[in-house]
Amino acid sequence: MEKTYNPQDIEQPLYEHWEKQGYFKPNGDESKESFCIMIPPPNVTGSLHMGHAFQQTIMDTMIRYQRMQGKNTLWQVGTDHAGIATQMVVERKIAAEEGKTRHDYGRDAFIDKIWQWKAESGGTITRQMRRLGNSVDWERERFTMDEGLSNAVKEVFVRLYKEDLIYRGKRLVNWDPKLRTAISDLEVENRESKGSMWHIRYPLADGAKTADGKDYLVVATTRPETILGDTGVAVNPEDPRYQSLIGKFVILPLVNRRIPIVGDEHADMEKGTGCVKITPAHDFNDYEVGKRHALPMINILTFDGDIRESAEVFDTKGEESDVYSSEIPAEFQKLERFAARKAIVAAVDALGLLEEIKPHDLTVPYGDRGGVVIEPMLTDQWYVRADVLAKPAVEAVENGDIQFVPKQYENMYFSWMRDIQDWCISRQLWWGHRIPAWYDNDGNVYVGRTEDEVRQENNLGADVALRQDEDVLDTWFSSALWTFSTLGWPENTDALRQFHPTSVMVSGFDIIFFWIARMIMMTMHFIKDENGKPQVPFHTVYMTGLIRDDEGQKMSKSKGNVIDPLDMVDGISLPELLEKRTGNMMQPQMAEKIRKRTEKQFPNGIEPHGTDALRFTLAALASTGRDINWDMKRLEGYRNFCNKLWNASRFVLMNTEEQDCGFNGGEMTLSLADRWILAEFNQTVKAYREALDNFRFDIAAGILYEFTWNQFCDWYLELTKPVMTGGSESELRGTRHTLVTVLEGLLRLAHPIIPFITETIWQRVKVICGITADTIMLQPFPEYNAAQVDEAALADTEWLKQAIVAVRNIRAEMNIAPGKPLELLLRGCSEEAVRRVNDNRSFLQTLARLESITVLPADDKGPVSVTKIIDGAELLIPMAGLINKDDELARLAKEVAKIEGEIARIEGKLSNEGFVARAPEAVIAKEREKLDSYAEAKAKLIEQQAVISAL
């Protein structure tokens, strides 16, 4: 084996070999249990980020673990067309390169342009997924816009429409005036903002007066430009100031519209003046109030967010109405919405109706992609009736057919599902699944899979002109069908029969409603088992937290704190990293700050760590459902772990290759250390499997680390040295056999988390064991064997380890050279302790560097010594001639003084109010942690001073 572990040399060739050999495919054995995971489809034109790496590591670990248990496993891979994101990327690209818009191209040519762009850049993310070691079945790769999935989408739309579960209606949506499309709540970013509250007088009609004799109401608003669309004023029915006015009217300033005063709980007596203007076409709350009181809806804005030339007036059902005039005063027509705000405030003021303006903190909705303020807009959209679909989906979680890990996410799911709103599924984009609906010139709507089908079903001749709906479906609509459309539905395929319902879905909690809930609803509606019972899409939902930076901040391009997972695998120079973080920024003014921070954090760029180290770190940080603060130190630690495993394997191979390891017969004698490591490994297998079965990847990683580093490398390899240097033939055979057996089992155990290094080493180890199989991937996963429990070996070895550690600690505390042989005395020994010393004298002497071991008689106190208590005995190391008492005390005093200086420095920092107020939470926590560890170190030094003073 190569002297040093170099992941760059082994990982890519190995992956290509695995893929070529077809090891990632299901084994096709239908007598075996199936296990299937559907990858959450990443955006086709995107690139891999830490969240992907994290979730995919967890999925691959599960898939490899189940595959090694002989199950028929499928990890289904694919990508998402990501409507709005992809269209924006391509629009930006043609604007930058050609100075054109999509309208210059026209719909078909622009869509061709997107397909072209997908062909060029769509492979990036799948290449990166290969680098992570993902054992997905690439031959089954799907894309949400490929033919099969597009057919499934049409099928679902048509069936839901025929069942009256899809309808078209005029509703209020989040409208992005820049992108000119409806967007989902998920794409709205609410920002805190300092604004104003305008108090405006609305004159009362018909001579009405308020309780205190005024002939007007004062209405408070943060959006005066929408006055043009007001159709009512709401007051709280309990408010004594206005109770008598409910049912009366006001005259709307500027347009002189007579609008009613309604009593509604939405008006808060404590807030503003207690009177709220109601604009049903431009505010979500007002829309609901309007529905309750049958107020008309008046749309005053164009899709670009400008004031219309004439308003659109609708009744509550969304039908056109002439109940109010559609006139808009000429001076406001065509004004941009924020310019209109200024003009309207000035006009109200000129009429003497502006009572006051107060500063006001408010939350403003922005589109997360377009970056402009979102308008609630009344538009014709397609909707799915969600309540009917939600009922069985709620029951499936209530009765345990679907379980959330961790369980607390069920509450989040229930709270949303039990109060579910109809789902707006249409988007005013060009890229996506076009809605399979056609209109004739009379405005009739026909829904079908194709235009031909529509004509046939409705007996429409060639003389009837049909035009297809311009809109496309929300990306989440096709994603909601992911678990079954990828397996060939609506055909009843073998894959669907074998792998549905799928086993586990790994997802971030942020898309629990947008994706998880909708998959459950759609799947249960369309997929039934042989008894007609609705099928769930998956049995378990494993929820992950977000990956944040080391200070707990969300990773984002604008913060400049994003780390590309592949930069940790391959390494990246500082100049390249700076270019990545500061090039093409939306906010170039942030570049300098980001540059400084990056130079401080990565002065030499990022070292290459290899895929296995990255995967191990991700698994180790995966504490259920919690956000993770990324830690480069942990990554270094797991890179060191891979080195340790490599070096330990080299040691084993050097001592076993071409040697008699007992695999072809011959007498074997197992030492206590051999029996101990076999028993220890057996226990490790049990705990490790339990952790993986319970989705505790963090615990599994910890168990693997602890066994490999501490038990196998630090202890067992040391404990084999006495046999290796002076054992009999049968003892040598026994120890070699144990070395190879445990290493081979350990490689299989670790394989799901760190696949590359384990396969590479296993290819060498299998030869010694006489294994002829091609790959570790398809080897059986280690199983716990109750017959291999060896309590005596475990207890005896733990005692020996205690004794060795005690001697080593005395050396360290007393500053005695590690190589200096010591005399060990044991006082007050139990019979068990005496037996253990006598049985393992040579082990103890070799590993603790002792020149002699003496068990003192019961009445012998022994010479002046440093002592340690272990089970059933007190260890004494006589100090005569070993240390100079005065020198040692002086050295310790110096150490104490140094630590006291550090403690004073940190205490000063933490008592500085300015520092505590400004520094991030994580930085303060780190300082407190340092303080605690210094205090602990000081206490230990003082203890040592006391021991030496007493000598």
From Swiss-Prot:
Coiled coil region boundaries: 882-944
Give the range the annotation lists for the signal sequence: none
**Which positions in this protein are listed as binding ATP?**
557
Q: Where on the tree of life does the source sit, at the highest rank?
A: Bacteria
User: Where does motif 'HIGH' region map?
Assistant: 42-52
Gene3D superfamilies listed in its UniProt record = HUPs (3.40.50.620), Isoleucyl-tRNA Synthetase, Domain 1 (1.10.730.10), Valyl-tRNA synthetase, C-terminal domain (1.10.287.380), Valyl/Leucyl/Isoleucyl-tRNA synthetase, editing domain (3.90.740.10)
Question: What reactions does this protein catalyze?
Answer: tRNA(Val) + L-valine + ATP = L-valyl-tRNA(Val) + AMP + diphosphate
Keywords in alphabetical order: Aminoacyl-tRNA synthetase, ATP-binding, Coiled coil, Cytoplasm, Ligase, Nucleotide-binding, Protein biosynthesis
Official protein name in the record: Valine--tRNA ligase
Source organism of this protein record: Salmonella choleraesuis (strain SC-B67)
